[in-house]
Amino acid sequence: MCKPRGPKLKTYRPRRVLDWTVKLLCRQAADEKDFKKTSTYSKLDVEAMHSSFFFNNAPIEEAEASSQPEAPFLLPLKKISIFFAKKNYLYNKGKFSRNKQTYRTGVYLCIWLTVLTVVGLYFYFYLMSMKFTYNYLLFLFFLGLFFYKFFIKKNNKKFEVHTDLFENF
């Protein structure tokens, strides 16, 4: 239910302009013209309403004073609908707003990429290597031949030391 902010109707103090704007936002969009024509406002708050740009086009009628203290502050609630509230900035900051949904989408994307990467790397490095180890044997054989030749030459001392580059310095 859309409730106005500020003091309740049981005081003689004038209502705040914010209270009237909240009540005006609670009407149905189709009833806007009828609402402005038939609404009555407090005569104590007429000057504040005239100073507000929101009420420049709204006809303001002074309520007739009666013996009841609440009479100058009455706004007929039958003429406004409490089932309509304008979507404002606070409303859009809810559960499924654009910013929060974008954030969630990014988080879920990172989680799925992590899962796919871990599963893929596990499959590639563990399952593939366990199933197809014989493919690496040829590579390891040629690598072993290189180191074998290196150690044979080192033990036979057939290395030539080239110091030509350093003689000019």
UniProtKB/Swiss-Prot annotation:
Annotated Gene Ontology cellular component terms: mitochondrion
Keywords, alphabetical: Mitochondrion
Domain of life of the native organism: Eukaryota
Subcellular location: Mitochondrion
Protein name: Uncharacterized mitochondrial protein ORF13
